[in-house]
């Protein structure tokens, strides 16, 4: 399994074996857009999760600034999804938000759309983590 920056955005991890070049490019854009939306680093891992969540947690630890990062790990052969948040990211991405993202991903995966499912999940997480705009009464 690859670890560290695999060239798919600032923090992404991707096991590229099941993915085409176009899909890898799409994942790079997805990760970059998510970072611009909420400021957290996002990583995507596609590949075997031999030890389930433990594998995902180990991959998350290799990200740049894991405390402020989110890893979406998908094992297509086992139909498994693991979402790991760092301690800072968890302040805005609780278990409920991660469950919602996982459900959206499963829906797309059921239609045989791996990259679309990852896109939906990462976008939901990024939008949920976005800081709300604060308006004050004295602002125009």
State what each model feature region is:
Residues 1-69, 77-140:
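A structural boundary signal for the start of the first folded domain, especially the loop/turn
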């Amino acid at each position: 399994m690859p670890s560290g920056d695999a060239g798919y955005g600032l923090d992404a991890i991707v096991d590229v074996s099941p993915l085409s070049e176009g899909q890898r490019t799409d994942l790079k854009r997805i990760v970059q857009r998510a970072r611009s939306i909420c400021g957290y680093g996002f990583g995507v891992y596609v590949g075997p999760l031999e030890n389930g969540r433990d594998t995902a947690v180990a991959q998350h630890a290799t990200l740049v600034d894991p405390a402020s990062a989110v890893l979406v790990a998908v094992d297509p052969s086992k139909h498994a999804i693991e979402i790991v948040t760092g301690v800072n990211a968890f302040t805005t991405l609780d278990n409920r938000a991660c469950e919602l993202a996982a459900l959206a991903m499963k829906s797309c995966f059921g239609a045989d759309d791996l990259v679309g499912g990852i896109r939906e999940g990462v976008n939901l997480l990024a939008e949920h983590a976005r800081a709300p705009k604060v308006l004050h009464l004295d602002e125009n």
